[in-house]
């Protein structure tokens, strides 16, 4: 294993120390328990956004803390969910009195620990809500989830809902918008190589030189199938059609009923695409894929979407939700109405994403 690290046990702490040293005007770090928060938190009268998950996916989530996105992020160990005490402490830190919205990727550990933290925060008098992101069309269940995994739409939700909170949306409005973004977004990913978790020291899985994994998860979870290597155009066509041709997905998700002070099941269905829809298109590197290859992929994706009568209004290309050094890409398509486009265009200033200021 070759990595630019010192001691395996110090990887997460040292990268956070580097983040704080590089961006002292944007973020602060609390080390016990571990969380990242924006320098001006809590912002009085503004809904605060908190997210988190295992480290190894940088810049998500800590790199998206700042004006126009997250108020706080809770990084666990590599590919390991943050603990309830981390999430609870971060929630207390950023609460400015207007409530806290937790944006949670659908991985079993994340879901359980955020639910526990929400209950602790509620018992402490904090007004809090959580919304689940489950946009991965590759599989319905996996090693880490019941139901679809939460992947690329998470980044888009943090940007859109973060801007809405900055603009003065209430907690209920932010939750409704986040729910809409999740129902409008779909993703799928592929891997050409595995990744190596520092504490493990060997690849998570093996892929031959002439193979790729279709439908991979961001922790190296198995996808739909392992296939012989194809051209980029062939792979991208498979990915885009897997998103566009996937039927409506109905599932029950647990959400916190603040008035009833209990968890309740809600039935949600994602929204299929149709000709004329406006999109935000997100082509993402899994960590080891260069921009040149991302743009080759984007070229083919744009061609297919145009043939289907879908209109790309905005895009994001780069490594924003990674899997350590994995070679591979993911594609996320988000149906975008005027509200979503307006908040996408709004100013953002974080270590990992910045425009408009």
Model regions and ranges:
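Short Gly/Thr/Asp-enriched flexible loops that form oxyanion-binding sites at enzyme active sites
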Residues: 111-125, 144, 293-299
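N-terminal amphipathic/basic leader segments beginning at the initiator methionine
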Residues: 1-49, 338, 347-357
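Mixed-charge interfacial surface used for oligomerization/domain docking
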Residues: 169-294
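C-terminal non-catalytic interaction/assembly regions of soluble proteins
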Residues: 262-357
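Short, acidic/small-residue loops that bind anionic groups at enzyme active sites
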Residues: 73-78, 122-147
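Glycine-rich oxoanion-binding loops at beta->alpha junctions
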Residues: 57, 66-97
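Short alpha-helices
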Residues: 133-184
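Short glycine-rich or small-residue beta-strand-to-loop segments that form or flank ligand, phosphate
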Residues: 2, 47-54, 70-73, 99-108, ...
